[in-house]
Amino acid sequence: MFLLYEYDIFWAFLIISSLIPILVFFISGFLAPISKGPEKLSSYESGIEPIGDAWLQFRIRYYMFALVFVVFDVETVFLYPWAMSFDVLGVSVFVEALIFVLILIVGLVYAWRKGALEWS
């Protein structure tokens, strides 16, 4: 029980920092004026009246490229701390990082072979 005593400040900070945005959200909902009408339902384009329909369909290719970007961006986030402490960690961690990169490369080659990355 004495070990948890050191984390009291952390838990208090976590609870307070979680409650403040929730309280602000609910307070703004209660204090904000409620006005319903056709102007509230229209889309806003920098003060200009919208022309045409505001809903556009994006091609699935955009999402595939975004997904591949996110995967390799997260890979960079994981590999950067490893690269900074490579001399301390040793060879076993190098092998683990190599396996991690190889798994991602296999996934990239699979997506490439399936044609998921072709723009046509």
Swiss-Prot record:
GO terms for molecular function: NADH dehydrogenase (ubiquinone) activity; quinone binding. One of its GO terms (cellular component) is chloroplast thylakoid membrane. The chain crosses the membrane at residues 9-29, 64-84, 88-108. The keyword Transit peptide does not apply. Its EC number is 7.1.1.-. It holds the Pfam family Oxidored_q4. It is a multi-pass membrane protein. The keyword Plastid applies. It is found in: Plastid, Chloroplast thylakoid membrane. It catalyses: a plastoquinone + NADH + (n+1) H(+)(in) = a plastoquinol + NAD(+) + n H(+)(out); a plastoquinone + NADPH + (n+1) H(+)(in) = a plastoquinol + NADP(+) + n H(+)(out). Keywords: Chloroplast, Membrane, NAD, NADP, Plastid, Plastoquinone, Quinone, Thylakoid, Translocase, Transmembrane, Transmembrane helix, Transport. Disulfide bonds: none annotated. GO terms for biological process: photosynthesis, light reaction. NDH is composed of at least 16 different subunits, 5 of which are encoded in the nucleus. Belongs to the complex I subunit 3 family. NDH shuttles electrons from NAD(P)H:plastoquinone, via FMN and iron-sulfur (Fe-S) centers, to quinones in the photosynthetic chain and possibly in a chloroplast respiratory chain. The immediate electron acceptor for the enzyme in this species is believed to be plastoquinone. Couples the redox reaction to proton translocation, and thus conserves the redox energy in a proton gradient. This is NAD(P)H-quinone oxidoreductase subunit 3, chloroplastic. It comes from Lactuca sativa (Garden lettuce).
